[in-house]
């Protein structure tokens, strides 16, 4: 009788860590991107919760008029927000150690910059983690590509726009009413509703919702019944089954007769590519539009573009929008400007004496 003994190679601590990080057998895949994603998202989430509850007012406009955003300072879930970093800080990197005290850091809105930078790094790593897991499993990389749309949108409003405008105080506040305020001010200053890229984004979001509802309802309505009338049709499905769970021919025929033949897909793969690509491309365009308007390449201006034979202006909807924009703009930062922005931009005369 012969016994064969094999020496088990001892793996270093670093090697075991690498194997654990890249293992697809874990309940939740970590990945190398996850090593950075986990601490950054935990930091952003923790600081957001603490600041939303208890942060003191922030001097957002840099004029010594603090704005309250937390629950303990009089706000509720709807009105509360993480107030953006002060205009006095501008685009400066403003960690806690750059302030003379924690009170000063809070007064100047340091938590906003901390949350935003950690959040953007975290969601970018989440996108990389999606690609990494797809690669490990031998899948195609399109899940990460689709997720790049919301990552691009978040980067546009939280980073690119403040860079273009010269201050993190112009970034989107982290709250419900703060988001709406950002949208209103953005329209007033950049006329985003008249920007073609925003129009493509609206078509992408609403069109994607419509197509998703149509697809889900068609599939649900054309299930291949494996149960009796007294049982739920869902009981006839078994996870991992090889058979089709719905009849695409029936769905194609229904939709083709409802509209016209070529309005429906007869290829499931091209159908699902379309369902993914439509909203993703639309949101890409919106993020690109925000990034261009950040540097004041604004929406179309058709103000007073229609006149009669006597040269008198015939108002169009573009003029109505322009009037609304002016009203919103004069209400924005009303204590920060003594003059309209266009007049305030003129160089002041020098004084001698």
UniProtKB/Swiss-Prot annotation:
The record marks 344-345 as: Cleavage. Chlorophyll a PD1 binds at residue 198. Fe cation binds at residues 215, 272. SUPFAM superfamilies: Bacterial photosystem II reaction centre, L and M subunits (SSF81483). One of its GO terms (biological process) is photosynthetic electron transport in photosystem II. The D1/D2 heterodimer binds P680, chlorophylls that are the primary electron donor of PSII, and subsequent electron acceptors. It shares a non-heme iron and each subunit binds pheophytin, quinone, additional chlorophylls, carotenoids and lipids. D1 provides most of the ligands for the Mn4-Ca-O5 cluster of the oxygen-evolving complex (OEC). There is also a Cl(-1) ion associated with D1 and D2, which is required for oxygen evolution. The PSII complex binds additional chlorophylls, carotenoids and specific lipids. Photosystem II (PSII) is a light-driven water:plastoquinone oxidoreductase that uses light energy to abstract electrons from H(2)O, generating O(2) and a proton gradient subsequently used for ATP formation. It consists of a core antenna complex that captures photons, and an electron transfer chain that converts photonic excitation into a charge separation. The D1/D2 (PsbA/PsbD) reaction center heterodimer binds P680, the primary electron donor of PSII as well as several subsequent electron acceptors. PSII is composed of 1 copy each of membrane proteins PsbA, PsbB, PsbC, PsbD, PsbE, PsbF, PsbH, PsbI, PsbJ, PsbK, PsbL, PsbM, PsbT, PsbX, PsbY, PsbZ, Psb30/Ycf12, at least 3 peripheral proteins of the oxygen-evolving complex and a large number of cofactors. It forms dimeric complexes. This is Photosystem II protein D1. It comes from Nymphaea alba. The gene is psbA.
